[in-house]
């Protein structure tokens, strides 16, 4: 190959000369790229409380309708059976009012306290809280939505139990409308207590045990007439959130109900409900970060 052809090949393969200004700008651009690191994309704003609460409530209510309807029948049948048994030893008066009111609120305790304690205990044991923790919703909306769904789910069973009890003991049905206030207030108090028990229990079995014990306390302290209880049991009865719902409902069976006392009982029940739901929200935050 001649020297002329060799020089032509080298000229083709050789890179084009870079101008001095471009060569000086290249390091500057590289340095600038290192100085200006890519910024992370901004996160989406968190969901507002009330829309999140409504979404959790609808989801939990639809789940309860599918999975909890048989248990609602069990709770209603259990309360009706207790009233039938008590009919043989209680004739009427204040004792009959206590039996009917306590059996009706027992349906709320069975679902809102017992089942909700088991539900949150299962969520914590199975890692289900991690799913809720990844959602952009406030922790309070998760607890309040589940509690409201379980409490409102008990209204049909409570109403059926109250109607059957009025027929068994010959009590007036004119005050059954008070259940529209008793069920949500007592349900909120019991659901908050059940959620707190389920979230604070270190094991799922202990959450189930706590829910069962709470329901048994609501049964023994709510259905039995307080006049026949020792003073120590009466004091323990006053510590149970459902007691004030039972008292408010029982007062409506009187010939002339003391509506001021009914309002006071409902107010205490609502205050206990706010406190128990606040404790349940704190327990949810505590369990979600562990």
What are these regions (language model features)?
Residues 222-277:
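Membrane-interfacial helix-loop-helix junctions in multi-pass membrane proteins
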Residues 2-39, 86, 167, 254-256, ...:
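Junction motif at the cytosolic side of a transmembrane helix
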Residues 139-140, 144-211, 259-266, 270, ...:
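Alpha-helical transmembrane segments and their short interhelical loops
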Residues 85, 96-168:
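Hydrophobic alpha-helical transmembrane segments of multi-pass membrane transport proteins
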Residues 87-90, 201-243:
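Transmembrane helix segments
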Residues 33-55, 232-242:
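Short, membrane-interfacial amphipathic segments enriched in basic
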């Amino acid at each position: 190959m001649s020297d002329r052809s060799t020089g032509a090949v080298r000229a083709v393969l050789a890179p084009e000369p870079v101008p001095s200004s471009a060569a000086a700008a290249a390091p500057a651009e590289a340095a600038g790229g290192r100085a200006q690191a890519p910024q992370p994309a901004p996160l989406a704003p968190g969901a507002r409380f009330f829309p999140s609460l409504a979404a959790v409530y609808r989801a939990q209510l639809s789940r309860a309708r599918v999975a909890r309807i048989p248990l609602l029948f069990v709770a209603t049948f259990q309360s009706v059976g207790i009233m039938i048994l008590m009919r043989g030893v209680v004739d009427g008066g204040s004792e009959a009012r206590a039996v009917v009111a306590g059996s009706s609120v027992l349906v709320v305790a069975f679902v809102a306290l017992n089942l909700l304690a088991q539900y949150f205990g299962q969520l914590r044991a199975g890692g289900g809280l991690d799913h809720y923790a990844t959602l952009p919703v406030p922790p309070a909306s998760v607890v309040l939505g589940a509690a409201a769904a379980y409490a409102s789910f008990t209204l049909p069973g409570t109403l059926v139990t109250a109607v059957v009890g009025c027929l068994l003991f010959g009590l007036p049905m004119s005050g059954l409308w008070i259940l529209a206030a008793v069920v949500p207030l007592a349900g909120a108090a019991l659901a908050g207590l059940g959620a707190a028990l389920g979230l604070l229990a270190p094991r799922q079995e202990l959450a189930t045990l706590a829910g069962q014990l709470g329901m048994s306390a609501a049964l023994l302290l709510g259905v039995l007439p307080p006049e026949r209880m020792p003073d120590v049991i009466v004091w323990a009865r006053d510590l149970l959130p459902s007691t004030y719902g039972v008292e408010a409902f029982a007062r409506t069976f009187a010939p002339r109900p003391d509506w001021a006392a009914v309002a006071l009982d409902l107010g205490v029940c609502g205050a206990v409900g706010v406190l128990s739901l606040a404790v349940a929200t704190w327990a949810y935050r505590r369990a979600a970060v562990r």
